[in-house]
């Protein structure tokens, strides 16, 4: 009773609020323009079909557009100074008519189109091509959501696939992971279902059955019920049904389920998605009239419908059965519209406008408006408000993309008094509700008898791009829970023992004949196992492995907002070489709670802590062995998902083998091999079973020169991680040199954990590295791809590394072990215990502790350590100097200095700079008549000359692309108003110098340089890390480019803004060119720069030497400036 009373009070309060908020809704249709500028909007609608029948658009909906335009024309806050008018075209659902209308309206300067109303892909594509905004009100097609193809298309109607988000949130809320899906076999519902399947794959939901049915017609009494067979096929292995179909079909499916007897127990639930429900009255919404199938209700809509029942026995018991079935149904549908006085007035105005010109509709009965009217009204108002915002911001109301951009990711108040949205794709977004049958006792909320009603028990809303579910509350602020049929809790998606009892054991069969002693023993064992199980589960849930990223301190220099600083890049070589401990190159080093650790990044967006993952992490924590690198923990904080292993300061075995300064004698090698074998023995006997990626880089050496195996286990944790984008093709192939042929042939299906036999093969490859001190297959002299291909092919005899170097250095027992470990058939390889026996001669006479032997090695290193340090320090200083010089050439000196110091360079706005653009007129023709090497030599000579000239001015060369040359002055160091003079003098100097330039291979050709300069504001900053560039952004760059492209050969084209600064400086001679039309800028009054004050002397620059023949010099001496410049 409390629930129903709360809902009733909510409806009353909402109605009063809406009426007060909209009390002033009293539009008058206005046709006169009142002296304002006229703009036009086009309306496309399927009023009638080609045969003259009623179209898909409900009759009264047309009246919504003139109503919206009239309200906007009366509102001084919308397009003030404009008079909005419209034209409309009945498309008859003919694409050609719609596209012709759009083209015609575009030619006539219409500011937007509402429609097309029947299909939308072709008209939307055309509108996007013509850059005219189009907002549709009934289109439910998926392709139009692609903004790269339909940049000017929006729709106020939400696409039906949005209901999938509400369905998934419902399943999440009630912990339902397995469902069967029943789908009406039409395009709309198939699209929704396909979308749901994609979402299910992302969230590990399971679809037990997919069932399709042909449309069910409740009026066709001879038509067989299609649902009975579906339920018979699925009921034994299903508890939750998701239904996609019309509301009448949902009713019939629920009644069939009731007849089949599956709803009596309350173990089954039907989740229906009603996407076509157009509710106009909250009373209808709750009274089930849109679900219940009564002739009385149909008669209220249209008396003709009632005559359909004259030959059928139809009683109230059918509706009683439907109500009983609906107790096991929950429905996801759109939020309702409350029928209020404001809604009735809106309906009246829409209908009146539809009856009036230019539609001149005919109406036998007083029609009811539907959601198409709301969507059309909203579409029109949103178009006009977008035009108003664009105009107010100084934009171009005829630029469709600019207009549409003001609506993307915006929220507006719909005519339904509900807040709707446009998402980033331009699709309408509306709230959804979750309905359930709730009893309404007599006297509650004005009810005259006990009844049932469909009330929302939750709402679905989209905020910040994410859908969320909010449960309804009663008047005591308690969650309004569903009244599950014949049960207190939501039904399970699978019986506790599984659909066939496979998850439970019938202990009675085993214990029935047991004697008391056995019961006592068994009870004790059960208690023991329960204790162990609880202890194990407690260990799984303890999260002792979890690392808080805030407690991790990396040795990397403080990073900028992009994750890496330029200083890190420049000094990376320094940090590796100067580290006396020879840090592991391929891992980030850090400290966690005082322990130095190696951080291995896992390239995943998030980690799902499934049982398998937690089990892995517990196993890793329990791994303890001298030759297994200890696991410290794992961080799952985004974006720092990583695995922390103990840091071994001597680096990897691969690092040691590549370091020629470390001399490895037989005793040293024997100790390393013994450590590696002991580590593999422990790994193969543990729960991890195998490594899977064993290679020399995954064998690390600590300060005591003990070899430890790392990068093992955690296969579920790392499953699905993305490829390292920084890893090149060569590195990817090189990683496979240790992989056994059977795993190479498995390609993408290779188990992440590998196999023990695969580890034995990898061990053999490591042995060849140890005794050759070279990378695997180094003597084979083939490309990596060819080597891997031959290993994978399984040729006879198997393709393996050439052992010339190994034969000369390794003892016989090692050679025998290598050959025994790499046969093609994994079954022919020995296990690790047999390998240890084969290599036992290596340990003869050696102690397990290598420290005594290492003391002698370190003494030998001490003799040349000082000399080695001095030599490496000098090499380091040289490389550092080269790096800094290169960076100063790539970037402005002040910017390069900041980056070298590790200071992040933030983008900066410069209020006034001057930009220079130039190109060579006729360069394309000259290039076509030249060889590529001639073009390169020409540009090299020309730009060498230019670079020598600009070094005398306060300018910075931004870039050269082909024959284009770009300069800027006034940044990154501001120079007052001098920037315009610096650019102008540079331009004058370059123009004079090019007149004496000779094209080596075509000396008769006169290079015609065309220059444009402009002054204004821009933003500059460093872009990129691998090859950083100092780039300029802003309209000033575009305008400078337009000045160059609209100039003339051997002339300097100056913008009016640049002229103002030059006039302020004085000393520059300019000539008025007049108005020049420019693409995207309109007409601009521009000028020619003719010269400068003689006191501004041009610095003499010695032209760089050109390789010219005497004949070329003589030809060039007789050339003249062409008449056309």
From Swiss-Prot:
It holds the Pfam family HNOBA. The keyword Transmembrane helix applies. CDD domains: CHD (cd07302), PBP1_SAP_GC-like (cd06370), PK_GC-A_B (cd14042). Residues 532-1125 are cytoplasmic. Residues 571-839 form the Protein kinase domain. Keywords: cGMP biosynthesis, Glycoprotein, GTP-binding, Lyase, Membrane, Nucleotide-binding, Phosphoprotein, Receptor, Signal, Transmembrane, Transmembrane helix. One of its GO terms (molecular function) is protein kinase activity. One of its GO terms (cellular component) is plasma membrane. The chain crosses the membrane at residues 511-531. It is a single-pass type I membrane protein. Belongs to the adenylyl cyclase class-4/guanylyl cyclase family. This is Speract receptor. The lineage of its organism: Eukaryota, Metazoa, Echinodermata, Eleutherozoa, Echinozoa.
